[in-house]
Amino acid sequence: MKKFLSLVLALVMTMSLVTVSAGAKDFTDDSEITYKEAVDVISALGVVDGYSDGDFRPDDVLTRGAAAKIICNLILGPTTASALSAGTAPFKDVPVTNTFAGYITYCSQQGIISGYADGTFRPTGTLSGNAFMKMLLGALGYDSSIEGYTGANWSIAVAKQAINAGLNNSLKGSFNGVKAVTREEACLYAFNTLKATMVEYDNRIVVGEGSSAVAISGVRKDLTWNKGTLNDGKIKKDGYVQFGEQYFEKLVRTDDTDDFGRPASKWTYDKKDIGTYVNYDLLVSEYTTKVKGGDVYSDIGSVAADYDLTYYVDGVKLEKDAVKTQSSYIAKKNDDKMGDSGNGVLTQIFVDNDDEALTIVEINTYLAKTDDYNEKKETLKFNEIYGYGDVKLTKKLVKAVEAVELDDIASIKDYKDGDMVLLTIANGEVKTITPAETVKGTEIDEFSKQDYVNAGQKYSYAATGKLDGS
């Protein structure tokens, strides 16, 4: 006879594992922001602001006038840029009283932006990805005439150059230069501009004079710092001038790791922390099922397979012998399972070619039962965390889970005794809590140690399944 059960479904999932950014601005719609690192850094610099009601509105489209303001804020800094004004109307639809008149005038004079053939600028019009990238490339020093950003095929040249410069790094999906840019995409592209290397031209030939002068040829090269400069390394220590190093001397990026051991960037501005963020530019692949050594080899290639390996499980760095074993599995067509990878485990693989470093991180999702929230202490404890401490690679290294404090995770006050939740844990500290999907009074159609079928839906276990009772 089929038995009716109350089931807690610990579904295989990739939880939102973003390091808390204590120094970043808090927007009321933070949960809707996809490019959190970019928005945090760009807003901390004052390049893009939120609205008076506390919203950021990441999906609102960027206007042409607002884009000009962003460029001026990047090049001049927000304080200097805010003082810009227009003595005369730069375009027939941009009077001197227009909010963006000063920004538009400056960008037009610098050759960064242009209007339409009918003499208009259309400041309230939307801006395509290609058009915004063209402006950013201009800020980096790329010459429109030399690089072919003019004529019928200008957008192709811009898209190619922007991608080569890394201005679309971390974009979800492929870059669509025809689509209107959203506010958070603008932040992402501007953020990538901060990290991009500036350029200059040798043997530049210019024809014409004044506003009609046009460069027709020149040899482009990356801009380098003079030997001994103190600015090199504030974004990347490579001898080249990154945009942020040139225009935001108080902005500093340093290599770091997040709580789970993933390669990360720590950002500070004027010696104040903005936040620490996973460096997804180094992420090669990720899995939520079993990973074979041969899979890793295929993902990273033969060169990176010889890099020094660092291996973390739930924020715990594996000891030398364990790492040596895991490293031996990374070979062509090898079927040995990497670590404790499997259902319910997020395995991420990072490759840093500059430092010749390979990092593999496993993050388990645990099912837990909560105790009552302690209002006096503002803490939440757990009656049981299923499977925690049983992970073979870290069994001897695992720490007891500490109570979660309200200051760290605000949602804990909503839980009561016996609630089932999903946790991620790093070095004994709970980092994320998410309510588990619970199905009550339902019927199990089929059951095995690997999976079960409930109401026609098949669920795979993260651990070996057990059925209690007859």
Name what the model sees in each region.
Residues K179, E185-C187:
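Predominantly the structural core of cysteine protease catalytic domains
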Residues V39-V48:
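Mature N-terminal segment immediately following signal peptide/propeptide cleavage
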Residues Y189-N192:
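Extracytoplasmic, non-cytosolic globular domains
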Residues A67-A68, G129-L136, A186, N343-V345, ...:
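Amphipathic, non-transmembrane alpha-helical segments in extracytoplasmic/periplasmic proteins
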Residues K2-K36, D49-F100, Q110-N130, L137-A180, ...:
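Feature responds to low-complexity, polar/acidic, surface-exposed segments characteristic
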Residues I205, G210-S470:
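Short, flexible, surface-exposed loop segments at domain boundaries
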